[in-house]
Amino acid sequence: MTNIRKNHPLIKIMNSSFIDLPAPSNISSWWNFGSLLGACLALQIITGLFLAMHYTADTTTAFSSVTHICRDVNYGWVIRYLHANGASMFFLCLFIHVGRGLYYGSFVLSETWNIGIILLFTVMATAFMGYVLPWGQMSFWGATVITNLLSAIPYIGTNLVEWIWGGFSVDKATLTRFFAFHFILPFIITALVMVHLLFLHETGSNNPLGIPSNPDKIPFHPYYTIKDLLGLLLLILPLMTLVFFSPDLLGDPDNYTPANPLSTPPHIKPEWYFLFAYAILRSIPNKLGGVLALILSILILAIIPLLQTAKQQSMMFRPLSQCLFWILVADLYTLTWIGGQPVEHPFITIGQTASILYFTLILIAMPTMGLIENKMLKW
């Protein structure tokens, strides 16, 4: 058995990636979220495949095909709600995974970090297109509003939007192409995940201390496989609670009304995991400025390795930087809440303040605090 595991051309790749992989002996539960993201991706692909068997990407039948899945297909409602709430769990794990990378300085592994940012953008694009497919009111108007943002691009904006729409408004052509992209992107994400892991295994994993872990490593199996299984169990628990007890908790009631181009919902908003970026977009009165701020709110992650001024990689022994990190987390909570509120006083002011704070913390406060801590440690 050992010979097959170590000599077979395919199995030995699996062996060196998940069984005999030397892993740092001190990585905490914050490192579980990578494997949980893999589990979420697998769940989304499997449930999505079964949903695609019954879904029709046509404006006249899309809404009723989703209703048909829930009412007539055996356990169709379970598959549908596992897919919808699985996306929420996916993003929850994704945000924690990125947060852990920021806190413990994993961004110094630049190739892994940059592929991670590309993955984040791809997953966000996939989730956005998936939200359009049920063809409810919020699906239609969300698609209209978000795709329309591209019209802010000078010269080519209007042509670009009409090219994406496949006409002069969000219609059948838009729905069909969104379904096609929503189906293919998870497989592209899977390929990117493999590249992400390839780069990670080139350098080895970071650890909570932010120091080289070469002197003290343990095999991935059985230690971290058991640990990841426990994490998976703890993820399944809230997911199943959501699916079976309140499947529509994170959804929008407007999406149970079929799409109607002649009736605008009183408050157009995306799913909860996009609300922080949506709040930043809305906080700037200028359309192009808002779109740039929206993109930069995610793209800013790419320049974080350049902003690292502290001599210590991890924040574990930097209490002042820890304070700023948790202020950033609180700020993102605030932006998420603001994104779901109507555009009126005092929400506009709170949103603008939180948006300024978000960029200030990352671009100015954290690098400055790194320098201050170096001085305090006489480095």
UniProtKB/Swiss-Prot annotation:
Heme b b562 binds at residues 83, 182. The chain crosses the membrane at residues 33-53, 77-98, 113-133, 178-198, 226-246, 288-308, 320-340, 347-367. Binds 2 heme b groups non-covalently. GO terms for cellular component: mitochondrial inner membrane; respiratory chain complex III. Its cofactor is heme b. The keyword Transmembrane applies. InterPro entries: Cyt_b/b6_C, Cyt_b/b6_C_sf, Cyt_b/b6_N, Cytb/b6-like_sf, Cytochrome_b, Cytochrome_b_C_euk/bac, Cytochrome_b_N_euk/bac, Di-haem_cyt_TM. GO terms for biological process: mitochondrial electron transport, ubiquinol to cytochrome c. The cytochrome bc1 complex contains 11 subunits: 3 respiratory subunits (MT-CYB, CYC1 and UQCRFS1), 2 core proteins (UQCRC1 and UQCRC2) and 6 low-molecular weight proteins (UQCRH/QCR6, UQCRB/QCR7, UQCRQ/QCR8, UQCR10/QCR9, UQCR11/QCR10 and a cleavage product of UQCRFS1). This cytochrome bc1 complex then forms a dimer. Heme 1 (or BL or b562) is low-potential and absorbs at about 562 nm, and heme 2 (or BH or b566) is high-potential and absorbs at about 566 nm. This is Cytochrome b. The gene is MT-CYB.
